[in-house]
Amino acid sequence: MTRDEALPDSHSAQNFYENYEPKEILGRGVSSVVRRCIHKPTCQEYAVKIIDITGGGSFSSEEVQELREATLKEVDILQKVSGHPNIIQLKDTYETNTFFFLVFDLMKRGELFDYLTEKVTLTEKETRKIMRALLEVVCTLHKLNIVHRDLKPENILLDDNMNIKLTDFGFSCQLQPGEKLREVCGTPSYLAPEIIQCSMDEGHPGYGKEVDMWSTGVIMYTLLAGSPPFWHRKQMLMLRMIMDGKYQFGSPEWDDYSDTVKDLVSRFLVVQPQDRCSAEEALAHPFFQEYVVEEVRHFSPRGKFKVICLTVLASVRIYYQYRRVKPVTREIVIRDPYALRPLRRLIDAYAFRIYGHWVKKGQQQNRAALFENTPKAVLLSLAEEEDF
């Protein structure tokens, strides 16, 4: 058993062990382990996040105090947003001299990232449901002046009905009126341009809640395309792409999506934060508008007859278009199989079945390797790297 797998001493954490029985590991963070646990009085399953604030004894006293304060701040924010249907619920907390135990709802469906790895890409309908719920969460947070700062598919959990729960508020912060942040934190491929600029320019005014909207745009693009909008194997070049806002709708997957969904993505991925779409504005976007039955006008008999005529004409036109379509021959399939939508999805699905184990298997492996993510990556000194 490794140090990470070892459980805290039962004597020092007596109150926790009296109420909960820890089980297998579900995930890991930089200084924490998430386990499934059983509530002894009710036999109910939960997830417990066990945070070692000493770093296994490697942290200095200042670092221990800093991590302790950060954990208390996370607990405070979770309590302030308690009750929201799409935010993970904090059920219980325990504290010792070296550990915190945070007990949450158990989301058995796992991370949105794993679901996306399995599905490759999502339909507009699936994306609409997930993004509407996520934007409603972000809207609630921003009304409380809370910025999450680490929005990504790994921090979005799913229940059995595909409802989402936002989790991991470790980087979250509640801003005072007019306050700006300068700390560089988050996951590289989801960082907003202004966060990167803060690390390079001491005179930069800082950033605010708008960084969450940029990350939301990256998530939406990734759900639809199956890969992030900004990616390069060299991290510095990827960060430059982010700062320049250089992305494209060039992959074949985008041919299957409407201009409406592309328009919403482009409103999120705006380099200047003041021009970026807010959560409230995004929810009013046509992509989320649906017909309400009561508001659909009733047709007159003449109108119904007109609809019938148009339907017949459309059916005839579709029939003749079908007759004119050239059959898919063996030569066409051999020449460009990826141009055919059914084959494209089949190829992608089998490619992920073959290579997916390289990404998400193994307890010590980074589950986000597919997108070059680094969980809890803090870019402390980008300016010390090669110049842009």
Swiss-Prot record:
Enzyme nomenclature, EC number: 2.7.11.19, 2.7.11.1, 2.7.11.26
Family annotation (Gene3D superfamilies): Phosphorylase Kinase, domain 1, Transferase(Phosphotransferase) domain 1
Subunit structure: Hexadecamer of 4 heterotetramers, each composed of alpha, beta, gamma, and delta subunits. Alpha (PHKA1 or PHKA2) and beta (PHKB) are regulatory subunits, gamma (PHKG1 or PHKG2) is the catalytic subunit, and delta is calmodulin.
PROSITE patterns cross-referenced by the UniProt entry: PROTEIN_KINASE_ATP, PROTEIN_KINASE_DOM, PROTEIN_KINASE_ST
Function description: Catalytic subunit of the phosphorylase b kinase (PHK), which mediates the neural and hormonal regulation of glycogen breakdown (glycogenolysis) by phosphorylating and thereby activating glycogen phosphorylase. In vitro, phosphorylates PYGM, TNNI3, MAPT/TAU, GAP43 and NRGN/RC3.
Active-site residues per Swiss-Prot or TrEMBL entry: D150
Record region (Calmodulin-binding (domain-C)): 343-367
Family statement drawn from the similarity comment of this UniProt entry: Belongs to the protein kinase superfamily. CAMK Ser/Thr protein kinase family.
Listed PANTHER family: SERINE/THREONINE-PROTEIN KINASE (PTHR24347)
GO MF annotation list: ATP binding; calmodulin binding; enzyme binding; phosphorylase kinase activity; protein serine kinase activity
Superkingdom of source: Eukaryota
GO terms for biological process, alphabetical: glycogen metabolic process; signal transduction
Domain notes: The two calmodulin-binding domains appear to act in concert to bind a single molecule of calmodulin and are pseudosubstrate/autoinhibitory domains.
Classification lineage: Eukaryota, Metazoa, Chordata, Craniata, Vertebrata
Chemical reaction(s) catalysed: 2 ATP + phosphorylase b = 2 ADP + phosphorylase a; L-seryl-[tau protein] + ATP = O-phospho-L-seryl-[tau protein] + ADP + H(+); L-threonyl-[tau protein] + ATP = O-phospho-L-threonyl-[tau protein] + ADP + H(+); L-seryl-[protein] + ATP = O-phospho-L-seryl-[protein] + ADP + H(+)
Protein known as: Phosphorylase b kinase gamma catalytic chain, skeletal muscle/heart isoform
Top-level EC class as recorded in UniProt: transferase
Pfam families in the record: Pkinase (PF00069)
